[in-house]
Design a protein with these regions (language model features):
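Intrinsically disordered, low-complexity regulatory segments
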Residues: 1-161, 165
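Prokaryote-biased recognition of long, low-complexity C-terminal linker/tail segments
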Residues: 5, 164-213
Length: 213
């Protein structure tokens, strides 16, 4: 089985527990396992300029930019590790995978993007643990779940990523054009900034008052 963790440190911890102690270039091997890792997001949603050359310039008339078919990119500094994972997935002795990325929405997305970008069709299971203690890892491998059990989690993560893209790309370009300087807008960033601004305004307008208890 090929086990894919979210980062090298987690992969090393898992490998130590399941007996994959032989170090290779970009992965570890042993006891019937291959253990490798992502480096955060190996695959990301492509920027607007990937869809059309004219989107590389920020113009009001091009808004909104609404992709009909989402495209993905692999950053140059992460291509080597992606190629390693894809190569491992294609090995004939790999009959299945274990998704061992972080137990959460974002971890699910990181694995699924790599899995799909690599064109892998092999079945996978999910390791869902919240502790990297040896006992927790052993227990997690004893209770692996079918990967399909987490399809809805992946869909929610994908929806979040696409929503961030649509709001970030379009709103940032719109307000930057209107204000004639870069003004970033984000689905989470901007409401959070509003909370801070409101709080600062209250602090600035505070006036001392006498009161009695």
């Amino acid at each position: 089985q090929l086990v894919i963790a979210e980062k090298p440190s987690v992969a090393r911890s898992i490998a130590g527990v399941i007996g994959a102690d032989k170090k290779q270039d970009g992965y570890m091997e042993g006891n019937g396992y291959l253990v490798s890792w992502c480096i955060g997001h190996l695959v990301s949603l492509a920027d607007a300029g990937t869809y059309d050359e004219r989107f590389k310039k920020w113009r009001y008339d091009d808004l909104p930019i609404l992709p009909q078919q989402w495209q993905y990119i692999i950053p140059n500094d992460k291509k080597k590790q992606f190629d390693t994972l894809r190569s491992l997935m294609k090995r004939p002795d790999v009959t299945g995978l274990v998704c061992a990325t972080d137990a959460g929405r974002e971890g699910e997305l990181i694995f699924r993007f790599v899995y799909q970008m690599a064109g892998c069709k092999k079945p996978f299971q999910r390791l869902w643990i919240s502790s990297m203690e040896d006992a927790a890892i052993k227990d997690g491998f004893a209770h692996l779940k079918p990967g399909t059990d987490y399809d809805n989690l992946y869909q929610s993560a994908l929806c979040r990523a696409q929503a961030d893209w649509l709001v970030g790309i379009n709103a940032t370009r719109l307000f930057s054009i209107l204000y004639h300087k870069t003004l970033t807008v984000g689905r989470v960033q901007t409401p959070t900034l509003k909370i801070l601004v409101d709080r600062e305004a209250k602090i600035s307008s505070f006036q001392k008052e006498k009161y009695h208890i």
